[in-house]
């Protein structure tokens, strides 16, 4: 998969275009994305989110996939528009939640919008956690740990500082991970974590 060959179905394309237009109209009253990325939203946000789709684990009955700090809906809403049906978009900001609900309505996405902080989510309820441009890897692991099932995974796209974040996180956690090169930036990687546990400082 590469940036030049990435494509969507006609229906997905239409819904994603509606979604992008909605972001631009709401951006005037709610800060959804960086202003400098508005003109390059398709590559910078949509494709950057969509590339996660084939990295997600199979849907597990009775469990969900949390998008923590969903903000404007990247990556979760894009993945839902592409057909993923177990997503819960978690966003603590009420105005951003209002936007997400409107985007869900306009695109008819099969997704749950929850105005909630990650710390308040039910334990052991997710088979995967995703997050994009939310917090450091170490903080994301701290938030994700109680939410995941035993075989749950974390999928976190990270930018130019991915290596620094990973090294810092490894001071606090034993991490079983693999890297997938981002198709939207040569300096970025997607960190897929299949298993992790806190390092016991008492040892």
PLM feature spans:
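Class I SAM-dependent transferase core
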Residues: 1-62, 66, 95-109
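Residue-level signal for inorganic ion chemistry
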Residues: 23, 79, 158
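Conserved SAM/SAH cofactor-binding pocket of Class I
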Residues: 50-131
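Active-site capping/gating segments
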Residues: 88, 161-203
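Short alpha-helix immediately C-terminal to the canonical SAM-binding loop
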Residues: 96-98, 137, 162
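Short amphipathic alpha-helical segments
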Residues: 101-102, 141-143, 167-168
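A short glycine-rich, Lys/Arg-flanked "PGG" loop and its adjoining helix->strand segment in the class I
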Residues: 141-153
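Conserved beta-strand signature within the Rossmann-like core of class I S-adenosyl-L-methionine
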Residues: 151-162
């Amino acid at each position: 998969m590469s940036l030049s060959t990435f494509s969507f179905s006609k229906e997905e394309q239409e819904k994603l275009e509606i979604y992008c237009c909605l972001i631009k109209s709401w951006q005037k009253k709610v800060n959804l994305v960086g202003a400098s990325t508005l003109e390059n939203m398709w590559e910078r946000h949509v494709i950057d989110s969509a590339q996660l789709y084939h990295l997600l684990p199979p849907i597990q009955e009775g469990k969900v996939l949390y998008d923590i700090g969903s903000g404007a809906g990247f990556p979760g809403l894009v993945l839902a528009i592409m057909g993923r049906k177990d997503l819960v978009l978690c966003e603590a900001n009420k105005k951003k939640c209002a936007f997400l609900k409107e985007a869900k309505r306009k695109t008819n996405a099969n997704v749950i919008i929850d105005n909630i902080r990650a710390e308040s989510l039910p334990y052991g309820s997710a088979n995967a956690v995703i997050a994009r441009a939310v917090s450091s890897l170490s903080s994301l692991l701290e938030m994700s740990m109680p939410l995941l099932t035993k075989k749950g995974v974390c999928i976190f796209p990270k930018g130019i500082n991915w290596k620094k974040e990973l090294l810092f996180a490894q001071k606090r956690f034993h991490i079983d991970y693999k890297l997938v090169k981002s198709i939207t930036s040569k300096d970025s990687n997607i960190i897929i974590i299949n298993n992790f546990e806190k390092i016991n400082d008492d040892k």
